[in-house]
């Protein structure tokens, strides 16, 4: 578990760490645990990656959960970012991600993928089967 708010929770046992974003841009003074961060540009990845265990880069694809929130990147721009060492194993792809995107995300050098809308929109037995397929496909990373 990673706390995205209420960073005081990170002092409890079994929490992985904290997640920084625009509302919570800095770790508490003296915090020495796991830190991740949301980034919405390649410039932010360059700025924050070295001080985090990993970062989320979004939106890679048109958002599923946020209607009208389009991708901010082309495949070409992401390939160039990989070649420049910006995208690497510490960068996770977020935004519009489905299992069908895993091969491309992996080939672009991302360390993994973050799914929100693809999971949130599933219910019942469809959810369980879909989750099993995600686990099988995630072996690409």
Locations of regions flagged by a protein language model:
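Glycine-rich phosphate-binding active-site loops on the catalytic face of alpha/beta enzymes
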Residues: 20-29, 56-69, 102-137
């Amino acid at each position: 578990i990673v706390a995205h708010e209420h960073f005081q929770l990170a002092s409890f046992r079994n929490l992985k760490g904290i997640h920084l974003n625009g509302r919570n841009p800095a770790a508490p003074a003296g915090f020495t645990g796991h830190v991740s961060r949301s980034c919405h540009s390649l410039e932010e990845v360059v700025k924050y990656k070295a001080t985090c265990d990993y970062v989320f880069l979004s939106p890679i694809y048109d958002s599923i959960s946020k209607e009208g929130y389009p991708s901010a990147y082309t495949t070409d721009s992401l390939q160039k970012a990989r070649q420049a060492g910006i995208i690497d194993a510490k960068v996770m792809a977020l935004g519009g991600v489905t299992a069908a995107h895993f091969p491309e995300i992996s080939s672009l050098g991302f360390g993994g993928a973050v799914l929100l809308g693809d999971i949130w929109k599933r219910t019942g037995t469809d959810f369980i089967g879909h989750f099993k397929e995600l686990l099988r496909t995630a072996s690409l990373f």
